[in-house]
Amino acid sequence: MTDVTIKTLAAERQTSVERLVQQFADAGIRKSADDSVSAQEKQTLIDHLNQKNSGPDKLTLQRKTRSTLNIPGTGGKSKSVQIEVRKKRTFVKRDPQEAERLAAEEQAQREAEEQARREAEESAKREAQQKAEREAAEQAKREAAEQAKREAAEKDKVSNQQDDMTKNAQAEKARREQEAAELKRKAEEEARRKLEEEARRVAEEARRMAEENKWTDNAEPTEDSSDYHVTTSQHARQAEDESDREVEGGRGRGRNAKAARPKKGNKHAESKADREEARAAVRGGKGGKRKGSSLQQGFQKPAQAVNRDVVIGETITVGELANKMAVKGSQVIKAMMKLGAMATINQVIDQETAQLVAEEMGHKVILRRENELEEAVMSDRDTGAAAEPRAPVVTIMGHVDHGKTSLLDYIRSTKVASGEAGGITQHIGAYHVETENGMITFLDTPGHAAFTSMRARGAQATDIVVLVVAADDGVMPQTIEAIQHAKAAQVPVVVAVNKIDKPEADPDRVKNELSQYGILPEEWGGESQFVHVSAKAGTGIDELLDAILLQAEVLELKAVRKGMASGAVIESFLDKGRGPVATVLVREGTLHKGDIVLCGFEYGRVRAMRNELGQEVLEAGPSIPVEILGLSGVPAAGDEVTVVRDEKKAREVALYRQGKFREVKLARQQKSKLENMFANMTEGEVHEVNIVLKADVQGSVEAISDSLLKLSTDEVKVKIIGSGVGGITETDATLAAASNAILVGFNVRADASARKVIEAESLDLRYYSVIYNLIDEVKAAMSGMLSPELKQQIIGLAEVRDVFKSPKFGAIAGCMVTEGVVKRHNPIRVLRDNVVIYEGELESLRRFKDDVNEVRNGMECGIGVKNYNDVRTGDVIEVFEIIEIQRTIA
């Protein structure tokens, strides 16, 4: 083929010269319009164009098939379901070179597999030949051994043949005798079964006839109705009575219904009709319905409600109560909901609630006291001695700074034996003094809370109250509180009018003020003695003591001196070196060192006793206060102290009290009333002030805890996370860090390890010695948690003079600011005829086409209200702001 030029080739292919030159360039051949093209170059261009325009290497075909499936539904209606099946297939175009390479690899793989197969066949043939040779040798050995065994067996068979014949003859004879006995027994059983079946059939027929006659005549059953028989045969009568008892027993006992059913394999016991009648009488048919019978009445007498005696302990779960009443737990829960209490099946309820529920459901309740062990321990005490006169126990109360402490100091310094070395070394909280007319025991600082709790627990620890009132100050709030405590305790009051030596003293005013609260002097016809004293000068102290002894003589105070002691805890605290220490006032008996005492939730052996001077004593009689050591823990102020015989029983009683206190507490906490349920649902978030409280004595802990808990409101609550007696330890600091609480120490300090934790965790630690300062600061902390009060304040008014349309904002109100200032980012209200018709915010605030943040009084502006286009001339736009006002707790 001759060479042609680019132009000629372009004319032949009917394309432009530039495109042809570009195609040659793409194929790697550089040509111009006048250059010639050889045949080799043409072939190169054709291959390049074929490769470029060869089409896609992959072809995907998709096919969808739709069909409808009818599914039968409920109510006889069918349901149509559309089903679509999608199929997808992909074809890949292989490269010729790739196809040749794959074919070569497949051929090589087939040859390798063929070679491996031939080698495997040859190896298998060799192994089979070797195995056949081994098996032939083993077979020859086995045949030789079997031949030897057969020969030996032949010899044994000949020798034992005669013995076997003898044994077979004997066995055949025994078998024949056994078969004969079995045939005889079966014949007897068949005859007896036929007789019983006939008797039962006759009895059943008689019973049916009797029932039919009874229901037809509608007659009342008589006493001899069970003795009615329809046959004269004695055996038939017995079978009839037995059948009646079985049927009636099956009706009366639902649990023994299985016993009344016919056995599965007993086909000859009764006929098919009889078996159906028995099944219908014992249990219901399919679906709970009884199978009808033409000869049996379907009426059944309703069961009478069973009233049971329900024994209820101090606590019981709902499930246990249901089991005692033999009802379902859901019925008990329903009854509790009717009474207004929500409960679950496993919830513990108290004795009163369980009693109400059981009586509501018609049962008789027997309340059981579970403290038999405690009563047994308390009754095992030798307290049968005669009562003797005892010293009075006096509590001195009064307002702050009225000279109460000075009066006590003067009495102690003058009446305590002066020969005591070191004087009063310890402040025990109670002490006794000797006078010419007798002994008096004073309670120093019981605190009002401890005083009230002792009276509430029935501990007759206080006999007389000395009310100290300053002659120059008169009756103060705490004086009134002391009078209320004395009246609640129903104890006589002796009034000591102190500071009588001051020039401004006015004892008559004190009498007049006290008379308003029911404290009348004897000269006015009352029962209270008034004594004028001066704690500073010592005036009237002897008269006060004589008045106390006179009042005690009127009361005729007596106590048993011999026997096992009992008393009350005046104060308790935890000493770092000695452990739990309790100040005990003995009420009766004599307390000895080494006695086993039971004190509330605690118990122990008295290891040491000390009097108010800090001296060791071996015994303490009635009205004597002592410190005792050796208890298992710190008891609560006001707890009863009792001496018992056995330490093991004392421990059991203490543990029982702890567990019972916990159960009763949980039962009362879990009790939720229906009327409170919706209130609890609607309550919002309640803030809590968590406090870990430590104080020097138990009385301070109780008083501070009660005062703080009374500060709680609906929005902020005070929560005492932990409290105790003694210094602040590392455990207290860790507890405060975990619960985000405030550490409060009242007359105590934190140790070194606790201070490290407090510094590391940045805890809030506060020390106090005055309870009023503590309460004020907790109030301030609670006030900070109150949500602020929101108040709306109007800051500007704008009157709409005209309304314009804007393509961007919609209706624009042309306004004149008449009052205050209009700010862009504040909420607004639209008023029409002084009625609010819209509340929202501004979208645009302009003045002379400029966006501004505020427009003041007397200036015009354009206002665009967001999401509101119904602004009219004459409307008023009110701009306001929301102010937060911090609230405080009163």
Swiss-Prot record:
Residue ranges of the region described as 3: 288-391
Q: What happens when the gene is disrupted?
A: Essential, it cannot be deleted. The C-terminal region (residues 165-890) is sufficient for growth at 42 degrees Celsius, although it grows more slowly at 37 degrees and is cold-sensitive at 30 degrees Celsius.
| Ranges where the record places region Disordered | 45-304
Query: By its UniProt entry, which PROSITE patterns does this protein fall under?
Result: G_TR_2 (PS51722), IF2 (PS01176)
Q: Where does GTP bind?
A: 398-405, 444-448, 498-501
Q: Which residues form the tr-type G domain?
A: 389-558
Region described as 2: 104-287
Look up what happens after changing M165 to I/T.
Produces reduces amount of isoform beta (i.e. only beta1). Reduced growth at 37 degrees Celsius, greatly reduced growth at 30 degrees Celsius. Growth is more impaired
Give the region (6) as residue ranges.
669-890
Residue ranges for the region (G5) are 534-536
Q: What keywords sit in the KW lines?
A: Acetylation, Cytoplasm, GTP-binding, Initiation factor, Nucleotide-binding, Protein biosynthesis
Annotated region (G1), positions in chain: 398-405
Give residue spans, biased composition: Basic and acidic residues.
92-217, 267-280
As stated in the Swiss-Prot or TrEMBL entry, residues carrying the post-translational modification N6-acetyllysine are K808
Q: Which cysteines are joined by disulfide bonds?
A: none
Q: Where is this region: G4?
A: 498-501
Subunit text? Component of the 30S ribosomal translation pre-initiation complex which assembles on the 30S ribosome in the order IF-2 and IF-3, IF-1 and N-formylmethionyl-tRNA(fMet); mRNA recruitment can occur at any time during PIC assembly.
State what this protein does.
One of the essential components for the initiation of protein synthesis. May protect N-formylmethionyl-tRNA(fMet) from spontaneous hydrolysis. Promotes N-formylmethionyl-tRNA(fMet) binding to the 30S pre-initiation complex (PIC). Also involved in the hydrolysis of GTP during the formation of the 70S ribosomal complex. Upon addition of the 50S ribosomal subunit, IF-1, IF-2 and IF-3 are released leaving the mature 70S translation initiation complex.
Tell me what this protein is called.
Translation initiation factor IF-2
Species: Escherichia coli (strain K12)
